[in-house]
Amino acid sequence: MQESFLFDPVPPDSNETLEEINKELLERARALPQLSGRVFILGEGVKGARLALVGESPGPPDAESGRPFMGPTGDLLERILQAIGLKRSDCYLTNVVKYISTGDELTNDILNFFTPYLQREITAVKPNIVVTLGNRPTKALLNSKKPISQMRGVWQDYRGIKLMPTFNPAYLLRDPTKKREVWEDMKMVRDALTASS
């Protein structure tokens, strides 16, 4: 890939629709040889959702259903949301990269291709709060080099939107000892949502 879009300006009050953003993303992604034949899983939820959750990339259960955050990772995410009084349908769910990939496959070129679309997606949804699930989503939106272990639990600002970095539910399935930290982060999200309603 030759194109680098990471720092393209995104109008803060864009009137783009999610449909327009997704159409452009799919047209451009399908034209790239390294992405041909991929199954793309786009964001799910409504414009105006108060909470947006951003993961790294879809997993195999997502491809089967065509929806983000399915299977064991999605089940755990739904339990986390229920614990703070939300349902999946209350939120907007998306990933930085829109196709199933391995961690090794996520080069800077791939991330630079997808990040501006994620930024435009967040602008179109207009959530009150964004929760980034893991290193790559946090770096994509905040352009930070710090690991998630140093970023989590501290409110960040993303273009005037409160952003809470935390661990990805997929990581919690591998290391359940981090659940307490995610619970502390999500209580802060719950309190901020309550205060803004």
Task: Label every model-predicted segment.
Residues 1-197:
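A polyanion-binding, active-site-adjacent surface
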